[in-house]
């Protein structure tokens, strides 16, 4: 609710239109469960795909040519590939859905590289990473949002969604030893926003609160329609990586490398 109010407040303050995109919950929760059962780091790929698809569909609907993204080098410029594989690999996505899912996807908006190219070249829609063009300091940005746009902090990176916050702070850390703070801090150290010593000191504490995590487990299990015991069993499955499942890594790498050469773009990061 807090995250929704943040969005509405910002839209109202900036006098821009607000439109929500509602997913079919039965399909979406089945997808979330499928990725959890696959036991891969990309447990939140259904959310990533839905956001990309919804943004492009709505942009095309209204003839909007630019989508502004908050992705940036300053806080997200460093990320190991095995921590989060390409969400737009539909071979990987579809295999996990068919192997571990129980509901046929009829309404869920998918977004693979074909649709990405369609929207880019036929609809003329571009994703603009505006924060890469200005000096961006996370703490200063948060302060500005609070003071000018009535924004309220929700307790941690990506905790605008309880599920995403849980995945990044607890699931990834316990199953794979992945601590997203290391990636964020590494980027901030490179930009001079944080000292290496400060980052090391902050990493001494766990990325989650034990009491809060237990509450989150109960909440998420209920939302996904499984018992707490079943949810714990899923969480305790041995971890796997995208290479353990069918994927189009080589094909997509070739396509994106060719695209970069044709349009003279440097291979710096996903944004």
Residue ranges and their predicted role:
Residues 1-271:
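Nucleotide-activated chemistry modules centered on ATP-dependent adenylation/adenylyltransferase
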